[in-house]
Amino acid sequence: MFNLLLDFDGTLFDTESGHEAAYLETFAHFNLGPCPSYESLKGIKTREVFDRYQSIHYNTDEMAQYKSSAYQAGLSAVKAFVDLNLLNQLRVKGVGLYIVTGGSRKSIEGLLNLHQAKDLFNGIVCAEDYYRSKPDPEPFLHCIRQYAVTGEIHGVEDSVQGIQSVRAARLRAIGVHNSEVEKLADAYYPSINTYLSELIER
């Protein structure tokens, strides 16, 4: 059995601008000071980001909910990086497809439903399902345990934290879309679709 454990934001869907705008709006609304670069926040749970800014005036849940609502407002504008037809071909060939993300289940399933893509995946692991964020291996290890994934497993990621998480889980790390991860990954593809096409043909 061959399996792909796929990151979501920046790997399957072009969500970066939406998340970045939502973080900027939230930091401004709560007067939290300069917002960190989105690159440094990739793969980290939203709650963990705002844990650092909790105060007597605002709590983590309040800030995380505001950010989530700001992101949800622009969900319909998010485009797919991945060719969903390629994922469907892999599924037909018997490849196991799993999402492993630091995003909330509401955001992930909302976007998948908009693209009628939820049924392509054998399982989805979201921020609510584990304790330690990427670069810790827990998100990927949790997916393997939760869905009893066996056989050859590749982890596909676009961020440094994500690739580190895959490697810490002792999986083959496939980097996509971000040249910063090329030196860390076992293999790198500028487009996830090139990688998926290779898998279909092999």
Set out the residue ranges of the language-model regions.
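Intrinsically disordered, low-complexity segments enriched in small/polar residues
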Residues: 6, 21, 36, 69, ...
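Structural motif
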Residues: 41, 100-102, 156
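N-terminal helical cap/lid subdomain that shapes the substrate entry/recognition surface
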Residues: 2-84, 89-93
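Substrate-recognition element of Asp-dependent hydrolases with the DxDx(T/V) motif
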Residues: 85-113, 166
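Asp-based, Mg2+/Mn2+-dependent phosphohydrolase catalytic module
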Residues: 1-2, 105, 109-202
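Short, flexible loop segments at the rims of nucleotide/cofactor-binding pockets, characterized by
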Residues: 73-78, 102, 131-132
